[in-house]
């Protein structure tokens, strides 16, 4: 078995302990009958500042403020002739095309992996031993597609106009968050910084790359971890979300990437990285002594007929499950009927 003390990460254990010990100290000295909070808060971790929190009552005012700032900057850019209505409309083409193509690639790409490597179906929790290599593969492939599309559909001196579509889409995302998932309202923070970048782009012909990177930092620190966390936490079928978030993050970082002259070359570089990560994943795709094949074994009793069975989710029966199920186990649906799951 892999779940042994020797495989335990000491850093991971210390990390979990850093969560637990403050809670023990807090609750040990707190009246447990008075724990109910009057308000709900939004929480987000940021570098240097660490934990940032604010009440749910701030979400709508912040959303309204960001929307008004966005509209003001649009009118300001049009008035100063820094924005073009035609180019702003064209800016939706590379953005939506990248978003849709990468989403489709992420969804069907993982289904293709399951066809090429059927042994992955044996892993019930959905995250394979080489899962991190697949995340890297799909992320770099998404970047390659996005760089190639933006290289094809954008031109110089109109960088601010191409930033309107991503900002509008992020506003719509935050509107959906306000309605459906208020705990994720911290998504608005990188949009604030994006609007500052947008203002700088309208004021300066060639903004400082260092300043743009600084303003892009909140988006990187908040959204980049989510690209990995969704597949790790929910299984590799969520690679589609990683691909979509990669495009959304790329678009939010347009003030940095937009002024790159060699987007086509960067696309090729990303393809090379994607190829490397796919090859790496391929050589770690089989089960081995270090990457053991997982087994499932379920004890099932039909109380109506007072009969018991051994069942499994495994697609391939190995020596261990065979000793319980026999050499030719029958399909469990014949036993479970409508109770199968």
Language model: regions and residue ranges:
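Cytosolic-side membrane-insertion boundary helix
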Residues: 35-67, 84-88, 132-133
């Amino acid at each position: 078995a892999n779940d042994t003390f020797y495989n335990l990460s000491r850093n991971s254990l210390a990390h979990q302990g850093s969560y637990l010990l403050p809670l023990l100290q807090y609750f040990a000295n707190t009246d447990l009958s008075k724990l109910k909070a009057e308000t709900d808060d939004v929480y987000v971790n940021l570098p240097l500042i660490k934990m940032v929190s604010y009440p749910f009552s701030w979400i709508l005012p912040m959303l309204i403020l960001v929307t008004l700032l966005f509209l003001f900057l649009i009118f300001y850019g049009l008035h100063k002739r820094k924005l073009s209505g035609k180019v702003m409309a064209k800016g939706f083409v590379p953005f939506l095309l990248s978003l849709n193509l990468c989403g489709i690639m992420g969804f069907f790409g993982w289904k293709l992996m399951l066809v090429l490597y059927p042994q992955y179906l044996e892993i019930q929790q959905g995250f394979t031993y080489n899962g991190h290599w697949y995340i890297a593969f799909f992320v770099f492939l998404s970047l390659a597609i996005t760089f190639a599309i933006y290289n094809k559909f954008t031109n110089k001196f109109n960088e601010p106009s191409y930033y309107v579509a991503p900002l509008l889409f992020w506003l719509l995302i935050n509107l959906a968050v306000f309605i459906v998932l208020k705990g994720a309202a911290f998504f608005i923070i990188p949009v604030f910084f994006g609007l500052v970048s947008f203002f700088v782009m309208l004021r300066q012909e060639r903004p400082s790359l260092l300043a743009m990177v600084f303003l892009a930092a909140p988006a990187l620190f908040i959204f980049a971890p989510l690209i990995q966390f969704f597949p790790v936490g929910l299984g590799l079928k969520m690679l589609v979300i990683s691909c979509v978030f990669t495009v959304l993050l790329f678009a939010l970082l347009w003030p940095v990437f937009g002024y790159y002259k060699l987007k086509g070359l960067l696309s090729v570089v990303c393809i090379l990285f994607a190829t490397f990560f796919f090859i790496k994943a391929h050589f770690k795709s089989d089960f081995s002594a270090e990457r053991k094949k997982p087994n499932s074994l379920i004890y099932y009793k039909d109380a109506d007929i007072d009969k018991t069975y051994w069942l499994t989710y495994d697609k391939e029966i190995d020596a261990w499950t065979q000793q319980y199920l026999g050499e030719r186990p029958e399909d469990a649906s014949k036993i479970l009927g409508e109770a199968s799951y």
